[in-house]
């Protein structure tokens, strides 16, 4: 099945690009687009549902609700599946790998009614790879209210960690040197350098200073996103709170070294 990548703007997936394609299925992560960190607003979600509704039964949306649990500063938006309803064109996917642990290996799918019969016909003999004990344990964890309380504790902890990293970056960099984005959802943020050195110099400096980070341009599959240059993708999910200040200082040294190296070439 041929797949095509579409551009992302400040509101998420470009509907102009999608409408200009011959796609029958659109795979999207509206809650938190990786790696840009963009959350699709309600208006764009309604437009996406309208795109599918223009060809009923022939267009579908696969909604991967990636990172929807980790929204810190604003109220959560309704999912596409929730907006469309059970008879809508949305296949909803989610997992417990981020909110609990990857080792649980439990994910789930919510199908629209019009696809349920086809699924039961084609996959009626399919057996899941996760044992019933794990599934029933998770079900009890959810229905008992423990999962909700667990998520609340996680959000509090990750928000504090994000705040510590943001404070460290703003201490190490002058306002005119760095712009931060993608702060409100998920477990990573974007740090865009002003007048940045080449990305190749940043990669070399990251190796030199032992910093594990990626660049936004690493995810550009079209080779045309020039605005991605000089933008670091910084994950903080496993960063100890006590190390945030040192992380900001090391990142500053990394960027200085990259700029000096590029100036000498």
PLM segments and residue spans:
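Short beta-strand->loop structural element characteristic of the AMP-binding/adenylate-forming
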Residues: 2-10
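Active-site phosphate-binding strand-loop segment of PLP-dependent enzymes
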Residues: 10-72, 262
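Active-site-adjacent capping/gating segments
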Residues: 86, 199-203, 213-241
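Conserved core segment of the aminotransferase class I/II
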Residues: 86-156
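Conserved glycine-rich beta-strand-loop-beta hairpin in the small C-terminal domain of fold type I
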Residues: 139, 155-166, 178-192, 204-205
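PLP-dependent enzyme catalytic core of the Aspartate aminotransferase-like
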Residues: 208, 224-265
